[in-house]
């Protein structure tokens, strides 16, 4: 389904949250056992639709497929065909990831100017602009400077993420902003999170909702298979990491 491009204000700014939601966010890294947070209506409807159109227009997507090694202690990249040929228990993850983002801003880029401007505005926000920096400071201990890694992903039929933890990384938490306006409940692609005590939380990728997920030892997360016959579940993932950490791919 095509959606008209809506103009967005220059500055991306999340909508104000209810007191209970703010409390849950402040406790995100301190709660024991861990608790993810799922917020509907993260941006204004106008900004979410405009950003979604810009992300869907990204021209360069690459299938990112990985399989587990024999002892399931690490993964390695493979081709999509190798992933399909692997046994089900070896299939760690497969979905499309946007590549060559910097080239979109080169002189002569075919990426439409309005999308370039909107994407640039979003990077100001997601790349530790003042609004996001102030919000993240509420969720972390004083004196812990953070930076962010941003990834754009989409899912085709059957794409999924297997159960894993990312606890070996330096990531403190991940924000996932879902930008598929055509998402329906039976499309699948649900983010699952299991805490240290074995309790599961399910977060459907509803349009303009945001999942905020702590990354810690003893917790795992996954994405259920994408059931739709169309490409969808367009997602912006923002991983918050200490400034000394080495950037890595957002899972």
Predicted regions and their residues:
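A short coil-to-beta-strand element that immediately follows conserved catalytic motifs
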Residues: 142-151, 187
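Short, conserved, surface-exposed binding loops centered on an aromatic residue
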Residues: 138-144, 164-169
């Amino acid at each position: 389904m095509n959606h008209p491009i809506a103009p967005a204000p220059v500055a991306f700014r999340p909508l104000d949250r209810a007191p209970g939601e703010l409390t849950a966010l402040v406790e995100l890294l301190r709660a024991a056992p861990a608790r993810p947070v799922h917020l509907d209506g993260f941006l204004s409807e106008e900004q979410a639709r405009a950003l979604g159109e810009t992300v869907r227009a990204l021209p360069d997507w690459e299938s990112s497929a990985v399989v587990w090694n024999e002892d399931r202690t690490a993964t390695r990249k493979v081709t999509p065909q190798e992933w399909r040929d692997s046994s089900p228990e070896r299939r760690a993850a497969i979905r499309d990831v946007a590549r060559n983002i910097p080239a979109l801003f080169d002189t002569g880029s075919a990426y439409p100017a309005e999308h370039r401007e909107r994407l640039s505005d979003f990077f100001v926000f997601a790349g530790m602009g003042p609004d996001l920096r102030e919000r993240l400071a509420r969720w972390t201990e004083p004196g812990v400077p953070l930076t962010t890694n941003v990834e754009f992903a989409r899912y085709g039929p059957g794409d999924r993420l297997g159960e894993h933890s990312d606890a070996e990384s330096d990531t403190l938490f991940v924000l996932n902003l879902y930008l598929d306006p055509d998402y329906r409940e039976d499309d699948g692609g649900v983010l699952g999170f299991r805490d240290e005590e074995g309790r599961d939380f399910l977060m459907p990728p509803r349009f303009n909702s945001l999942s905020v997920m702590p990354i810690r030892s003893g917790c795992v997360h996954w994405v259920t298979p994408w059931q739709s016959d169309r490409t969808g579940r367009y997602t912006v993932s923002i991983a918050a990491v200490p400034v000394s950490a080495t950037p890595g791919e957002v899972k």
